[in-house]
């Protein structure tokens, strides 16, 4: 081998090494950019993704900040009071603690005492949970009202 081919081989190795370093740097930069983007998405979505909290999980900060959240549990028996045309006051409980809920609007068909609910809303200055939306939960034996009516009609016709 002559001296010229050794120099070419050495310079080729240097060039390949530089390209590898450059490629590695680009990959690391892309990973860093994706990590920052993912962090920003998670940070922005932290309030949008709202799982419900049970009354015993409510903190003093939740009450003082008044930020929107979901309160979940059961409608405490004997606490439902209707106020005016579309207002209702009731307590949501998890059998450890309860929170007073004030709601003004149409109630879901499944809403009743002892039934599971998720109430979207916020705490006011007095510490009452002001509901803006109520989602009534049902158990595994739930059947829509229309289905029950059809079954009753069908059953009474057959007899």
Swiss-Prot record:
Cytoplasmic side: 1-23
Record topology, Periplasmic segments: 45-159
Keywords recorded for this protein, A-Z: Cell inner membrane, Cell membrane, Cytochrome c-type biogenesis, Heme, Iron, Membrane, Metal-binding, Signal-anchor, Transmembrane, Transmembrane helix
MF-aspect GO terms: heme binding; metal ion binding
Annotated residues for binding of heme: 138, 142
InterPro entries given in the database record: CcmE, CcmE-like_sf, NA-bd_OB-fold
An annotated GO cellular component: plasma membrane
Transmembrane segments: 24-44
PANTHER family: CYTOCHROME C-TYPE BIOGENESIS PROTEIN CCME HOMOLOG, MITOCHONDRIAL (PTHR34128:SF2)
Homology family: Belongs to the CcmE/CycJ family.
Protein name from the UniProt record: Cytochrome c-type biogenesis protein CcmE
Organism listed in the record: Bartonella tribocorum (strain CIP 105476 / IBS 506)
The encoding gene: ccmE
């Amino acid at each position: 081998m002559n001296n010229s081919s050794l120099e070419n081989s050495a310079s080729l190795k240097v060039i390949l090494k530089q390209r590898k370093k450059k490629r590695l740097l680009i990959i690391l930069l892309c990973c860093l950019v994706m990590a920052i983007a993912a962090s920003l998405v998670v940070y922005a979505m932290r309030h949008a993704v709202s799982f419900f909290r049970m009354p015993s999980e409510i903190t003093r900060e939740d009450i003082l900040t008044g930020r929107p959240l979901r309160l979940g549990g059961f409608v405490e028996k004997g606490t439902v009071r209707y106020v005016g045309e579309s207002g209702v006051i009731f307590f949501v409980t998890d059998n450890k603690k309860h929170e007073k809920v004030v709601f003004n609007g149409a109630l879901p068909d499944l809403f009743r005492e002892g039934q599971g609910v998720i109430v979207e809303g916020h705490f006011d200055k007095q510490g009452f949970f002001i509901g803006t939306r109520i989602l009534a939960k049902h158990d595994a034996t739930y059947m829509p009202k229309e289905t029950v009516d059809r079954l009753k009609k069908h059953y009474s016709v057959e007899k």
